[in-house]
Amino acid sequence: MSAPDYMQCAEDHQTLLVVVQPVGVIKNENFFKIYNRVSSVCQVNPMNTQRLLSIRYRHQYPVDNNEWGDFQTHRKVVGLICIAECTSARDLPHTILKFEQQKEAYSSTLYDSRLFLFGFQGEMADQSRIDVASYPSYDNCAAVDKRVEDFIQSLFIVLESKRLDRTSEKSGEKIPLLYVPYEKKDFVGLDPDSRHYKKRCQGRMRKHVGDLCLQAGMLQDALVHYHMAVELLRAVNDFVWLGAALEGLCSASVIHHYPGGTGGKAGTQLRQSVTMSADSFKRHRPGAQEVLIDPGALSTNGINMDASTEIGRAKNCLSPDDIIEKYKEAISYYGKSKAAGVIELEACVKAVRVLAIQKKSMDASEFLQNVVYINLRQLSEEEKIQRYSVLSELYELIGFHRKSAFFKRVAAMQCVAPSIVEPGWKACYKLLLETLPGYSLSLDPKDFSKGTHKGWAAVQMRLLHELVYASRRMGNPALAVRHLSFLLQTMLDFLSDQEKKDVAQSLESYTSKCPGTMDPITLPEGLVLPPVPFTKLPIVRSVKLLDLPVILRPQKVKNLLGQKLSTKSPFIYSPIIAHNRSEEKNKKIDFQWVQGDVCEVQLMVYNPMPFELRVETMGLLTSGVEFEYLPAALSLPAESGLYPVTLVGVPRTTGQITVNGYHTSVCGVYSDCLLDNLPGLKNNGCTVEVIPALPRLQISTSLPRSAHVLQPSSGDEVSTHVSVQLYNGETQKVIIKLENIGAEPLEKLEVTSKTVNTKEKFYGDFLSWDLEPTLSQFPLKPGNTATLTVYIKVKLDFSCQENLLQDLSDDGISVSGLQISSPFRHVSKPRVETKPVNQSDSKSSDFSHVKTLEGILNFKYSGGPGHVEGYYRNLSLGLHVDVEPSVFFTRVSTLPATSTRQCHLLFDVFNSTEHELTINAKDNQELILHAGECQRMAIQVDKFNFEGISDAPSEKQNYHNMKEIEEERQHSKGLEINSKLGIRWKIPTLKREGEASVEGVLNQLVLEHLQLAPLQWDVLVDGKPCDCDAIADCKVGDPIHLEVRLTNCSKNAVGPFALTVIPYQDYQNGVHNHELQDIVTFVGSNTFYIGAVQPMDRSVCFGALLFLYTGDFYLDIKFQDDNSNRELPLSWFCLPSVHIRAIDTLNETKF
């Protein structure tokens, strides 16, 4: 035999071989259409018997294999069906002639033959020929199946006659010797009458009859004949035929034990996997459909069975274990003859199929190992491919996947052997793909991210390189790029540094002609190659969605607690948020992005390559919201370690946006990398809410930017910092420019301020503004600007605490000789005399010490769709103010004035600047102070009524202890006094001015002296008030009326009081004359009595006196000392001094 039939299985021994061939020129499509129709008739019940006749069809069969038909009858071509195309009667003779010629090739073994003509429209001239049938077309041939069944019936008749002829031979007749072609020369010269020769003839004929019985469906008879043949042939040591008899016995037993067959689907797969060269593959490929029989349909051997026959069958039939032993024995006998190599190989294949059914893989592997070592004649390349492919399929059948992959790879390499003129790269590529499972290699990159690596990486890399090379030789660059990308992605950890460089360079070379994409590649065989994202080029270790910058972060307007709950709801509001695991799964984070704003995602990436990795583009993959990403390009150093990369984009719609991954372009390969497929990835959440668009506000000021960064204790962040230098008490006007740089109108603006990080005590409002002029320009359209005027007013403590005198003495500076009308009494004193500071005592005594004030101006604004949804933004402006000292009040005291309702405030003012400075109070002349000079300033002021401040009802609600309440009262008193004084300073050379506040300067004693007494006393002479050095004129001898009024401004009732009027004369030399009984006389008593006076009530008492001589007289009104009035302070009983001038009536007439 020339070519082994690797598709053989044990049940083929019961089949009749029919060859179907084309005659003349006929299209393969038409031929195989009819071939499939014919081969579908594979089992027939002949002559209405219970036997089952099985047919095996081939469209190609070597003639030399037919010569082995006597050795095993299933190898004999007993039927021939020819298919021809004949459209006219003129071509019919020529077609029939060719049909006859093709019959000659198998004439020695043919039982019958048929010729099917297609396209013949007329009537055949010779109607007597039953072996020729014509049909109008290939589609209109419904009777083909019936004619094939009739043809099989005729084969059965011949077969049955031959069987009967062989079994009915008489014992005396000479039995012919059956032999195989290579045995002809071996029997020359042998004695045909010898007993040995006769036994050989008998044994071979018994074996031959067994084959015929098996083909005829008589299994029991076949078993009997096989057993007899084995005994006869064993006796004469006819090893090859003994092996055939044993194999026949095994086949009959397999048919009995395994009615489903041993070939089955595996046989189909084997036929389909036969790989040939490019042209021969196309020509012979349809032969894979030569699956002929379904041995499972065999249920009887055609003989009427009874219990005895069942017992006999069980006795003659081999057990499953005996079947394997007999196969081994048969194969060992085959091995004794080199010419029986093909028979030996096919027997091994059949045994393997049986062992596969029995699930005895190790035993099957021994048979397959024998197949490998069977030495056949010089095989063609096509036959080598077929042999290795079948070995691979058989190893796969028994579960030896890696061994199967090995032989399949050998077959693939054989397809492109150097000896082949036209290498079959497509067949090679197909076979290489089929080897992947055997080497634990999948073309899905997801399988390599699940746990540890499986398989031998070195072998897998070699196989992937071969796939790349085969793809390139096939002329499919996209396929080569896909496999090379897969190699680089999945085998990166096993590549050396040089291999990494080489693979990357090759990939860049391939992608320059055909870029790598994320589209799946569908192969002609139907296999789909999934995309290969480069999740390792670079490796991403963490993904973090970043919040917007501080100036752009949206905030939600806070509603009232439970405001959104329905009033009809039965549920009680609770601030406790229920734990929801679905939120963890969604990974939603607690800040928002804004529609239309640039949003950022930070990736920590790592370059595992030993060279600089260039990422041409890198962007985000999102879902849920329309997102416009802004591609980034980066270059990572070799083995860079973790490297931060920020990817940005702009959400164009609102809703929930989920960052699913990122896409890259590396080495010409475009990759979509999903976060779910990244092992060991850390992220802070992938889903964020995108709220409606908001305007963007940009502010700029006339002040320079500050190098000081404000860090409020509250944690607020300040976006812009400016600084300014001011003198204490100075006010700075700042113009803030508000520009809408967004795409939405600015509709709402709120401005607030607060002071931070300062230990200095300041007075008044640090920052003030009027928002109405700015709001009048709203809504502010995109690109428009508005202005806001803000006043920075620094008013720190102007006192020098180290030298603030606690006594109210005049310090030796007399002012009694100055005119009362002058508001300023000043004496220039050296700085040493005033002793403002002992510079060696404290560092804080340095008058030039610069203090710092810091404040934040917060702009809360909104507009557009975001405003409708209740969102706003905050923009903060940080102010750093360096406050230089201007003036200090080193000493403060008071002097009584001529009026009981006035007093003099005395200030020692020190100029701590390096410039000449002027200072003045309201509507008064200026006092000039040189640098470092200290002067005293006296200001006459009306006393203050602090009762309204002291009784403020809301104070106790804002303070926690009495000390705080008292401090606030004192501050309020100082504020009122400061507003009345209006002291201001000015530096003419710098054109700068400011306020000098006395709020922190006045101590409690000074405040008491400035406070208007609760009991207000008024003295009137002849109805005219006597106060402020006023002189009342009267005539000698004329009585004058004296009226004393008391107004009770205290909270309690006072009185009764007794007041005594004592007149005296002042000689202006310190001597007072009280002995005036002969000069002044009273009309009535000189004592006035005032009863109890209720709060806010008034009491008046009247008297009169008479002056008998001219002169200047003074009236001293004193209270009688009694116990009832000692509880009231003496300051409450300050009555004005009364100055009366008595003139002579004659002198007045003369004037």
Curated annotation (Swiss-Prot):
It comes from Xenopus laevis (African clawed frog). The keyword Cytoplasm applies. The gene is trappc9. This is Trafficking protein particle complex subunit 9. It comes from the Eukaryota. Functions as an activator of NF-kappa-B through increased phosphorylation of the IKK complex. May function in neuronal cells differentiation. May play a role in vesicular transport from endoplasmic reticulum to Golgi. Part of the multisubunit TRAPP (transport protein particle) complex. It is found in: Golgi apparatus, cis-Golgi network; Endoplasmic reticulum; Cytoplasm. Keywords: Cytoplasm, Differentiation, Endoplasmic reticulum, Golgi apparatus. Belongs to the NIBP family. Pfam families: TRAPPC9-Trs120.
